[in-house]
Amino acid sequence: MGVMKEFKEFAVKGNVVDMAVGIVIGAAFGKIVTAFVDGVLMPPIGLMLGGVNFNELALILQEATGEAEAVMINYGIFVQTLVDFIIIAFAIFLVVRGINSLKRKEEAPKTPPGPSKEELLLGEIRDLLKQRS
């Protein structure tokens, strides 16, 4: 029974739950970005480049012969995935940058308070004693 209790404590901790929520939201965000890149961003870019469909861009290493399929390097899909990655990485960068700036504001050191009345009086007494000796 001890193992189950430990697992329950581990699974219910804030960090694990936060991480799980982050993973689910991240996966959904990735799908949104992929749909945006595939359906909205790449078609106009392909049109500007002379009607190129990035999904069909490939380097044929060996033509199809008989029953054997062609051997190709599909670099167009790679280009689209690279654009996906850049957009997601930039969005994550902006989020992390915002969080870091909030942390810096919270951690900003407060100016230390000036000396108390007792410290000032002790300093004056010290100075007077130095003058007498």
Curated annotation (Swiss-Prot):
Its main location: membrane. It is a multi-pass membrane protein. It comes from the Bacteria. PROSITE patterns: MSCL. Pfam families: MscL. Keywords: Cell inner membrane, Cell membrane, Ion channel, Ion transport, Membrane, Transmembrane, Transmembrane helix, Transport. GO terms for cellular component: plasma membrane. The chain crosses the membrane at residues 10-30, 76-96. InterPro entries: Mechanosensitive_channel_CS (IPR019823), MS_channel (IPR001185), MSC/AndL (IPR037673), MscL_channel (IPR036019). It is found in: Cell inner membrane. GO terms for molecular function: mechanosensitive monoatomic ion channel activity. Channel that opens in response to stretch forces in the membrane lipid bilayer. May participate in the regulation of osmotic pressure changes within the cell. Homopentamer. Belongs to the MscL family. HAMAP family: MscL. NCBIfam families: mscL (TIGR00220), PRK00567.1-4 (NF001843). This is Large-conductance mechanosensitive channel. The gene is mscL.
